[in-house]
Amino acid sequence: MELSYQTLKLTHQAREAYEMRTEARRKNLLILILHYLTQEGYMDAAKALEEETKLGLRRFEVCDNVDLETILMEYESYYFVKFQKYPKVVKKAPDPVENNLPSRSGGKNKRLTNDSCQNLPKICHQKSRPKTSAVKTGDTKSVKEHLKQVKESVTDTQAESTDFGLNISKIHKDQPEEKAQPRRGQIIDFRGLLSDAIKGATSEFALNTFECNPDPSERLLKPLSAFIGMNSEMRELAAVVSRDIYLHNPNIKWNDIIGLDAAKQLVKEAVVYPIRYPQLFTGILSPWKGLLLYGPPGTGKTLLAKAVATECKTTFFNISASTIVSKWRGDSEKLVRVLFELARYHAPSTIFLDELESVMSQRGMVPGGEHEGSLRMKTELLVQMDGLARSEDLVFVLAASNLPWELDCAMLRRLEKRILVDLPSQEARQAMIYHWLPPVSKNHALELHTQLEYSVLSQETEGYSGSDIKLVCREAAMRPVRKIFSVLENNQSESNNLPGIQLDTVTTQDFLDVLAHTKPSAKNLTERYLAWQEKFESV
C-alpha cells in the first residue's frame, strides 16, 4: 500500500482511539469488580486488587443503576432472546491441579483437555432424518429420483440453521427470476468513516470517566503475577524494580523546555514517532535504542526526562544507582536483568539512567583493581543493552551524565546518540528571565511588578545555566518580600491597623545586585565539554 501523510495520520489516530477504548474498558471492568467485591463483603480481595493495580480505584465510583450483576443479567436476557437459551458462563474444570502445572512433552499418559478440542470441526446435526424406507427394491428410476430428493432435503436442512441463529430459506427455480442489472461500484468514503469512528471513539472515551490524556498515575500496568519465566526470587526483585516505575505526573510539556531543540527532536524520534508511525521505522530505519544527554549541571537533562514521562505514552523507569546496586552477592546483575525484562514486559517503555557515571565508570581505571561485583553488574548492563539493539522491542534507554569522560567506552558504543546539553544561548536566557519575572506576576494574594531590561540582563547572565538563572530570579523576587517581614515583626501592637501589603517593583539594578552575589555553578567546565564533544559526538 502506498504511504501518504493522510494515511499515516489516520492510521495513528485509529490505533490511538482503539487503545483508548481498550484501556477504558479494562479500567471500567476493574472498577466494576472492585465495587462488586466491596458490596459482597470480600474486603481482603478488594484490598489485594487495589494494591496490585496501583491505580487508586477508590477515586472512582460506579454510576447509578450499573453494577456487575446487572450487566450479567442483561447479557443473559439478550442471549436468551437471540438463541432461545441461556448462556453457559462457567464450567467445571477437568482437573484444576493438573491444569496449573506446566505440561511436559514426551509423557506416556496425556489427558486431552477442552482446549485441545477447540480446533475440531463442528458437526451439523440434521433436524429430521430423510425417509428411505419407501423405496422399492429394483426400481432404478424411483431410486434415482428418491436419492435426488434426499440430497435436496439434506441441503435444505443444512441451510436452514447457522451458527448465528439465522433461518435461511432456499430460492426455488420456479419463481420468476428478475433480469440481473449491472450495478456500478458503490463509492464508499473510507476516510470519512474512519474519521467519524475516531471522533466517536474519542468523545465516548472522554465522556466515560477518564480523560483523553490520562495521567501516568492512571496508567494500568500489567500485573506481576503474569510475569512468566521468573521464579519466586526473581519475582521479589521484580517487585523492587517496579517501585521505580514513575507513576506521577511531572506536568512538563515539550513547550515548557526553552531551547534544547536538537535534544527534543532526537528524543521524539526515538520514543514518540516509532509508536505513532510504526510503518516508517522498519529495517535500517529502526528507532534508536540509546541516547546520552551530557553537559553541565542544571542545563535541563533531567527536565527532558520529565517531559518524556509526561508526554510519551510509555512506561517510565526512573533508575538510580541505589536501584540496581546491592550489597548481596549476585543481586546487582539479577536486578539489571529483571529491569530489562520488566521493560520488555511493559513495552513500550523508557529506562532513564540518571548520573550514569556512578554506575558505568571506566573499567580497569581503579587503582588496585575494581570490585568483582561491580564488574559483573557492568557486564550484565552491557549485555542487556546489546540485547535491546538486536530485538524489535520498543524499549529505549535515556541516560544523563555530568561527567561523560568517565564513562566506559563500551557503554558509549551502545548509546547511539550523544548530545551535548550546553549552557543556554542569549535568546534562551532572555526567555527564561521573562518566564520567571514577567512584567506582572500574581502569586496567590501577592502581586509582583517588574521593570527589567531583558536584553541587557540576558547579556549579563552569560555562563549561567538554567537552574542558575532560576535561582537569580527567585532571589530578585525575594528582596521586596523581605521588607514585609520587617513590618510584621516590628509592629508588636495588637491592633489590626496595619497597612495593606504592597510589594516594591523589581528593577534591573536589583537583578544586577543579585548577579554580583550569585556566581554560575559550571562556567569553568564549558571548554572541557566542548573538547569531549569533538571526540565523541554522535548526533
UniProtKB/Swiss-Prot annotation:
- Where is it localised? Cytoplasm, Cytoskeleton; Cytoplasm; Cytoplasm, Cytoskeleton, Spindle; Cytoplasm, Cytoskeleton, Spindle pole
Q: Which keywords label this protein? A: ATP-binding, Cytoplasm, Cytoskeleton, Isomerase, Microtubule, Nucleotide-binding
The entry's cellular-component GO terms read:
cytoplasm; microtubule; spindle; spindle pole
Q: Which family does it belong to?
A: Belongs to the AAA ATPase family. Katanin p60 subunit A1 subfamily. A-like 2 sub-subfamily.
What is the protein's given name? Katanin p60 ATPase-containing subunit A-like 2
Ribonucleoprotein as a keyword of this entry, yes or no, is: no
Q: Name one matching Pfam family.
A: LisH
List cystine links: none
Q: Where is the LisH domain?
A: 25-57
Location of region: Disordered:
93-121
Stated EC number for the protein is 5.6.1.1
Per the record, the major location class is cytoplasm
* Source organism of this protein record: Mus musculus
What is a biological process (GO) this protein takes part in?
microtubule severing
The terms under GO molecular function for this entry are:
ATP binding; ATP hydrolysis activity; microtubule binding; microtubule severing ATPase activity
Q: Which reaction does it catalyse?
A: n ATP + n H2O + a microtubule = n ADP + n phosphate + (n+1) alpha/beta tubulin heterodimers
Tell me the function of this protein.
Answer: Severs microtubules in vitro in an ATP-dependent manner. This activity may promote rapid reorganization of cellular microtubule arrays.
What Gene3D superfamilies does its record include? Answer: 1.10.8.60, P-loop containing nucleotide triphosphate hydrolases (3.40.50.300)
Enzyme's top EC category: isomerase
